[in-house]
Amino acid sequence: MSLMSDDSEVFVQAPTVANAELNIEAKPEANAQVNAEADSDANLGNNLGEQQTTDESAFGRNIGKFTAFVKEITGSGTEVEEQEKRNNHTISVDPSSNHENTSFEPTTYKILGRTYTSTTDASARVQELLWLSYRCGFEPIPKSDDGPQPITFFPSIVFNRLTLVNLSNLRSLLDKDHFTSDAGWGCMIRTSQNLLANALLRLFHTTGGQPQNFAVTKTEADVIELFQDTLSAPFSLHNFIKAANSLSLNIKPGQWFGPSAASLSIKKLVNDYNLIQQERRSERDSGRDSGHKVPTPNLKLHSKSADSDSDSDSDAISKRNSIPYVYVSENCDLYDDEINAIFELEQRPILFLFPIRLGIEQVNKYYYSSILQILASKFSVGIAGGKPSSSFYFIGYEGEDDLIYFDPHLPQIVQTPVNLESYHTSEYSKLKIDQLDPSMMIGILIETIDEYQEFKMSCFESDNKILHFHPLVTTAPRESSINQSWEEVQGEEEFVNLNIVKNEEDFVDLGSASTQGQNHEPS
């Protein structure tokens, strides 16, 4: 391993495999540019602004190389990339620009229940949403003895010096016994985090059903804190893996999640977190009754103090402080009496998750209009999944058939303190609906029984063919019964569905003796 440093960056050449193409060396012209910049610094630093711009460009180029490298090792190689070039479009709009396309009729954008005819307004809305992507250098996750091995090599990566607080961060990236990055295997977890994070952000930014401004606030910082890549953060990558393991899904670090595993993990993590919050509130209330002051939870997802003396304020705060109840339906059946009972008992919003497969190799055209109706609903919090070999977070659509999504496959370095700007992007990609993979997890956030009835009526009016509503539970709905632990991924696919048995055997049955102890590693 060799280190080369200049005034602004540290270049790390990590160990490489015997593939010369992965060993990306600095170009001669880049070295000449660095030397020229060093000479410029010696001349009283007259061109500091230009120097900073060049540094940022160098950082961008190297991150671009790293991203391309990750795509190569995760199955998104040249063949897939060429297909994406034909089908996908990446949009980056400067919100300060007033340029609109006046040659044609205005394009309509539907983004999580809001409608826009201005590209600038649509881009601004996209930038308000939270975006979670691959991270590198996070708290180590021990590998499993019979699971995949951590990636122990990287091409030349540029680290901004601010992200390298000490050498332990660098060493962690080269750890052979622990995962310190989810690049190549964590995209379904990241898109699930995207869905949950934006559901929470919407919930805590609303008052009486009316959205407030989505400026970067302490509320947003608190929501992001819940998803940090540490075991102490309730909705971290670490705890998704831990939850899946405790549910007998037996997913090991480095193995891929499907929509069902993701939805069940969210359900467990959120409901466990709610139990902890309820216990804390009970302790606080008991302390008040006895005259003793009990510390309030560190997490405050509201603007008022949790120590308000007003009973009405306390009740309102308690409601706003509640993470939603999670309801998972793999067959997309909803029973009115059961939903009503949950609202009465829980007294908090419900996050509905539907891990489904809408076809075999492709989404059946029968469901196209229903997918668009769900994304356009004001109760939608997006769709996770939906692309062969990858998982994306779909947040809406443009025109009639271009789905809009966030891509989690851009690796970012973990920063301390947390860089809030790294959880936002003005860029999104587009995918034709006929290119959508049938495996996905749909998210719907409903705050009251009246909203449930409103959503139900909107589905009836649009003849939604995905969701099925019933007045009574005639047969008690079963909890998810998945007897598959993880998927046997064909080729280098990263994302397949857990629910449908295919001839290619997309998953392994835990009950099958022939598969016990089988290792599964990214190729």
Curated annotation (Swiss-Prot):
- Output compositional bias ranges, type Polar residues: 89-104
Q: What is its main location?
A: cytoplasm
Q: Where in the cell is it found?
A: Cytoplasm; Nucleus; Preautophagosomal structure
A GO cellular component annotation in the UniProt record: phagophore assembly site
Active-site residues annotated for this sequence = C187 (nucleophile), D407, H409
Any one GO molecular-function label of the UniProt entry: protein-phosphatidylethanolamide deconjugating activity
Write out the entry's keywords from A to Z. Autophagy, Cytoplasm, Hydrolase, Nucleus, Protease, Protein transport, Thiol protease, Transport
- Write down the InterPro entries for this protein, in alphabetical order: Papain-like_cys_pep_sf, Peptidase_C54, Peptidase_C54_cat
Segments of skewed composition (Basic and acidic residues): 279-292
Keyword match Protein transport: yes
Region of interest: Disordered: 77-104, 279-316
**An annotated GO BP:** protein processing
Top-rank lineage group of the source organism: Eukaryota
Q: What is its EC number?
A: 3.4.22.-
- Pfam families xref list: Peptidase_C54
The record lists the catalysed reaction(s) as: [protein]-C-terminal L-amino acid-glycyl-phosphatidylethanolamide + H2O = [protein]-C-terminal L-amino acid-glycine + a 1,2-diacyl-sn-glycero-3-phosphoethanolamine
Q: In UniProt terms, what function does this protein have?
A: Cysteine protease that plays a key role in cytoplasm to vacuole transport (Cvt) and autophagy by mediating both proteolytic activation and delipidation of ATG8. Required for selective autophagic degradation of the nucleus (nucleophagy) as well as for mitophagy which contributes to regulate mitochondrial quantity and quality by eliminating the mitochondria to a basal level to fulfill cellular energy requirements and preventing excess ROS production. The protease activity is required for proteolytic activation of ATG8: cleaves the C-terminal amino acid of ATG8 to reveal a C-terminal glycine.
Family assignment?
A: Belongs to the peptidase C54 family.
Q: By what name is this protein known? A: Probable cysteine protease ATG4
Q: Which organism is it from?
A: Lodderomyces elongisporus (strain ATCC 11503 / CBS 2605 / JCM 1781 / NBRC 1676 / NRRL YB-4239) (Yeast)
